[in-house]
Amino acid sequence: MGKILSRGLLALYLVTLIWLVLFKLQYNILSVFNYHQRSLNLTPFTATGNFREMIDNVIIFIPFGLLLNVNFKEIGFLPKFAFVLVLSLTFEIIQFIFAIGATDITDVITNTVGGFLGLKLYGLSNKHMNQKKLDRVIIFVGILLLVLLLVYRTHLRINYV
């Protein structure tokens, strides 16, 4: 699979994460800035968020870990893991600075766990499947999921706006 396709998918996934985490899948990006209330929780797993939200945070970062491995095989596990952690922390800091939603250490932890699982899942899968085939499967499924997300959001917007 070409580097252009895999790097393009990683870039699209990063944009999707930004859209999802910071802008809550809103088409009107400015609407998230109407929140005007800062909320900061530094005690893990105690905020008013529900269990489902924590699971969702883990799930949305698993593909990110997978795509980091597809695109940056020459970089070791720890730098990629650190990047996932820093990205998640950056999202939460941006949410706090601009008063977008709630800033929660639990989100940093669950996002990072998701990225960790993606990184490890790739390593485990790589032991049982040819690397090129694994990369193709990840890229194909990634493209399919991004298309489904866009169709889902477009459908919601058309039918419910």
Curated annotation (Swiss-Prot):
From the record, give the cysteines joined by S-S bonds.
none
Q: Which Pfam families match?
A: VanZ (PF04892)
What residue ranges are annotated as transmembrane?
A: none
UniProt keyword annotations, A-Z: Antibiotic resistance, Cell wall biogenesis/degradation, Plasmid, Secreted
Going by the entry's taxonomy, the superkingdom of the source organism is recorded as: Bacteria
Q: Share an example GO biological-process annotation for this protein.
A: cell wall organization
Q: What GO CC annotations are associated with the protein? A: extracellular region
Major location category of this protein: secreted
Which locations, inside or outside the cell, does it occupy? Secreted
The record's section on PANTHER family has: MEMBRANE PROTEIN, MEMBRANE PROTEIN-RELATED
Q: Which NCBIfam families match?
A: vanZ-A
* Its job: Unknown. Confers low-level resistance to teicoplanin.
- Tell me what this protein is called: Protein VanZ
Q: Which organism is it from?
A: Enterococcus faecium (Streptococcus faecium)
Q: Which gene encodes it?
A: vanZ
